[in-house]
């Protein structure tokens, strides 16, 4: 079995648990980003941490250079999406194209039977024999959302040793194994964007920023100008105060709509952000499809709360209104704890 080792505590423990269980284990770290990183993954130091943990565990460690594939499938997609007014989740695209496509393919070609990762989710078998992706025991760390694009074919080759553990248990196991990563902080933010330059600094020079005008969502009154509509996000409050400070209202104001084509965005109150309909793109099914009219649970962001909804092929109707999800984010569909499928959000 080949363990994808990021250099963090989770994948370190995944490798340790599998080895202790008697599996023939090797580790591999993907070199994905050629630039600097300070997010806690994708850096030179992370590769070194993974190598040293593998040495501690007494397993072979490989390094796969997938920088070209990462740039083409994840970074370029991230840049192009922003240029077109979408806000993608690069971790989901990395899982889709790198970890569970390119990495899995490399592992199988090298003769491994399966791969394992340190994600917090569970892979189980249904009574019919198909593979099921389910939420982790640790609901605060559950990562089934970012794995919701996986097909049954990928699930059949995936082992997730941490799905039945709490994060605190994982750190304790790492400490008991004397792993150098036992106290290493979790990775944060987008791995290929340094915190000192942020999203604006990263996109500057990679896309053409579109200046735009802010309008009041109810009165259509012109409120001010923004340098880049691509850098606005739905629900944003910071950075729009200059245009909204003269409004005679004590309520908080949010970006409620962004229209790149007409170079405008609207600002309104929280109620103007709430929606009950979310338009979906093509659905990727995990192991079964849904009939229109099916009642499901949906999750619209990595840390979002589940919401009951009715599924209608190209859209969902939410039982309770929620904040508008940004186009380009992912809608994960659940029945109970089981992931049924997912789709890119087109509009809301």
Residue ranges and their predicted role:
Residues 1-148, 159, 168-169, 255:
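ATP-dependent adenylation/nucleotidyltransferase module used to activate substrates
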Residues 34, 116-348:
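AMP-forming adenylation/ATP pyrophosphatase catalytic core
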